[in-house]
Amino acid sequence: MNYEQAMEYIHAVQWAGHKPGLSRTRTLLAALGDPHKQLRFVHVAGTNGKGSTAAMLASCLQAAGYRVGLFTSPFINRFNERIQVDGQQIPDEELVQLVERVQPAADAMADVPTEFEIITALGMLYFACKQCDIVVLEVGLGGTLDSTNVIENPECAVITALGMDHVRELGPTLADIAAAKAGIIKPGCPVVSYGGVPEADAVIRRVAAEQNAPLTEVDFHNLQIDGGDLDAVTFDFDGLDGVHLPLIGSYQPRNAAVAITTLRVLRAKGWKVPESAIRTGLETVQWPGRFELLRHAPAFLLDGSHNAHGMRATVQSLKDRFPGEKFVFLVSIMADKDVDEMLQLLAPLAKQFVTVAAHTPRAMPAETLAEHIRAYGCPAEAAGSIEAGVARAMELGGTGPVCALGTLYFSGDVRQAFAAQTKG
């Protein structure tokens, strides 16, 4: 088996007809020797910010001297990004070897595992092989029935900002969504919650009490944002002052506050994470595709906000970092998202829209999306490819800013097309 064949195997597994649940993941991991039972975890769920928070936690724990696994989704450029140890992606040859181990176990199951369940098993195997001290484990979808929830006693469960997303799978209210996320709370295990949404907070508090799980809600009154530019945002939080965070979204200090709170909870459990390691980890964290500046002048931004809750935060960041500016927006949005609410947020900042379709069946066709946008009185044109869309957006932008956003699924293609446009 080579790398391409390994990728084909992983992606060939179909979701259709599978009932949600943990039984397949448990069966698969048992056939592989239960590698997850050798590991310790920080488990991270939430609607928005969970990937950024997970990356910050991993960076800080690594700075403290631990060998740290990081499991995230989706990927931006290459699949291997999803499974990392100490900031290094799983090498191709090791990924192939693990797929060769997982495939016979998966194929022998009467109820064949889903793609994400296979990826979860690959991650657990790799982290166990690398003898990670701790793994920062990002939930794929929801919490209760997510395949990552096979873990039994995390060092800490973290619930980041909650909002309306994946309502078909999780339920139509914030209370339903909170209940799904709160499914990662285990008996006696500490919980850190972003909080701030009364309907959701009530659910998380109730579940934590039922599980006898000590709950810490992040105190954002202790967060002071001192300023931000196109290189870093500077903040103070609860005695840790003057942190220069290279993730420049205005919302990122709040994610950092969640990470800091979590690391202090871990410290209380005996993990040796000094304040100096927290500072170093935050100031060196890398997390591509989240309000990422690919070029300063004229500005070209790449952002993965893919629901109204995330878009609201991105729009505020655009206003903060580029006051008074109008943008050429290069957009692709999944057809199952609240497209109109997202467009209503973007329209006041728009000079022009260029629409494309990300390479996934869920993406709204470019012309359909352009028609939605024109209904708001904004000029929009559809491009036949992401490459053509990037070129056209840059042409229309001129000396002004361009922002590509709407889904993480086109981030890698946009990055490649931008590099091709600007090389030489």
Segments from the language model and where they lie:
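ATP-dependent carboxylate-amine ligase catalytic core
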Residues: 18, 22, 26-37, 63-152, ...
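N-terminal leader/targeting and accessory segments in enzymes
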Residues: 1-48, 52-67, 76-78, 131, ...
